[in-house]
Curated annotation (Swiss-Prot):
Catalyzed chemical reaction(s): [ADP-thiazole synthase]-L-cysteine + glycine + NAD(+) = [ADP-thiazole synthase]-dehydroalanine + ADP-5-ethyl-4-methylthiazole-2-carboxylate + nicotinamide + 3 H2O + 2 H(+)
Organism listed in the record: Fusarium solani subsp. phaseoli (Nectria haematococca)
Coiled coil spans: none
Keyword flag Flavoprotein: no
Modified residues (2,3-didehydroalanine (Cys)): 213
GO molecular function: cysteine-dependent adenosine diphosphate thiazole synthase activity; iron ion binding
GO biological process, one term: thiazole biosynthetic process
Cofactor info, note text: Binds 1 Fe cation per subunit.
Function, in words: Involved in biosynthesis of the thiamine precursor thiazole. Catalyzes the conversion of NAD and glycine to adenosine diphosphate 5-(2-hydroxyethyl)-4-methylthiazole-2-carboxylic acid (ADT), an adenylated thiazole intermediate. The reaction includes an iron-dependent sulfide transfer from a conserved cysteine residue of the protein to a thiazole intermediate. The enzyme can only undergo a single turnover, which suggests it is a suicide enzyme. May have additional roles in adaptation to various stress conditions and in DNA damage tolerance.
Location in the cell: Cytoplasm; Nucleus
Protein name stated in the entry: Thiamine thiazole synthase
GO annotation, cellular component aspect: cytosol; nucleus
Length: 324
């Protein structure tokens, strides 16, 4: 392979220049008590000591904030189901365009990111076809330019970057290790309107067959964006639920791998499937019978952008409908 034709800017220089110094917990010894930077702690480890804490303080610090989030996001403006590359890209754009919207992200896995921590066959590099490189520049991920496509040296670099930006957004909460077990519905002239999600701990959901009395929780939202990936134990969940509800006759069935056909189809097809439910990413392939694209990630990112665009078109209407 020829060397890369060009290399993108690794990050916006202004962002790097303005990054604040990292602050660590201050110790209590005479050498570490006044330390406010890493450099001030170096070489003084013999007398180092952390600030004291009681175990209940740790418990309350976690519990108080989590239950405040549960209370706050019980009524959300948008719920994104799935925190893979499509879902995270959707959240990033929504945060940029409408920072006022309160958005919960529900991720079944302990670790967000979906399949975007590695490239194909557990390899490191991530390939994106142009013009998805525009989003990499937007979030500050460096890449090698190979002409019609670009290569990020490790997929985890993209995923960790977009995740860090999303989690710093206002009005954003990620509930990981949490899965969507069902959809909240309301009657409408179209048959049904989606108005929220039914949630549970993922570990609880995995044991419904051998345990009982494990009812779920709920989040009301006028708009749900589902990006759970192709058919799998937790994948394509929302569209599979639409089939069992009778809102979709059957799944289209994902077709064989064709990168050129698949990526265009996924981005163009990202839309509101039924009122209140937008579907993007590989979950859409199960609705439309689209081809799979394999280890190229541009469609996931740009489907996220289009999902955000579709959401902004209908959110005001769906909010007015969501009064009960």
């Amino acid at each position: 392979m020829s060397p890369p034709a060009a290399v993108s800017p690794p990050a916006r220089s202004a962002e790097l220049a303005s990054a604040p110094a990292v602050k660590l917990p201050v110790g209590l010894s005479k050498n570490s008590a006044a330390a406010t930077t890493v450099e001030e702690m170096e070489g003084k480890w013999d007398d180092f000591k952390f600030a004291p804490i009681r175990e209940s303080q740790v418990s309350r610090a976690m519990t108080r904030r989590y239950f405040q989030d549960l209370d706050n996001y019980a009524e959300s403006d948008i719920v994104i189901v799935g925190a893979g590359s499509c879902g995270l890209s959707t959240r990033y754009i929504l945060g940029k365009k409408r920072p006022d919207l309160k958005i919960a992200i529900i991720e079944a896995s302990v670790s967000p990111g979906g399949g975007a921590w590695l490239g194909g066959q557990l390899f490191s590099a991530m390939v994106m076809r142009k013009p998805a490189d525009a989003f990499l520049r937007e979030v500050g991920v460096p890449y090698e330019d190979e002409g019609n496509y670009v290569v990020v040296k490790h997929a985890a670099l993209f995923t960790s970057t977009i995740m860090s930006k999303v989690l710093q957004l206002p009005n954003c909460k990620l509930f990981n290790a949490t899965c969507v077990e069902d959809l909240i519905t309301r009657p409408s002239k179209e048959g049904v309107r989606i108005s929220g999600v039914v949630t549970n701990w993922t570990l609880v959901s995995m044991h419904h067959d051998d345990q009982s009395c494990m009812d779920p929780n709920t989040i009301n939202a006028p708009l749900v964006i589902s990006t759970t990936g192709h058919d799998a134990p937790m994948g394509a969940f929302c569209v599979k639920r639409l089939v069992s509800m009778g809102r979709i006759e059957k799944l289209g069935g994902m077709r064989g791998l064709d990168m050129n056909v698949a990526e265009d189809a996924i981005v163009k097809g990202t839309r509101e499937i039924v009122p209140g439910l937008i579907v993007g990413g590989m979950e859409l392939s199960e609705v439309d019978g689209a081809n799979r694209m394999g280890p190229t990630f541009g469609a996931m990112v740009l489907s996220g952008l289009k999902a955000a665009e579709e959401a902004l078109k209908v959110i005001d209407i769906r909010q007015k409908q969501n009064s009960f």
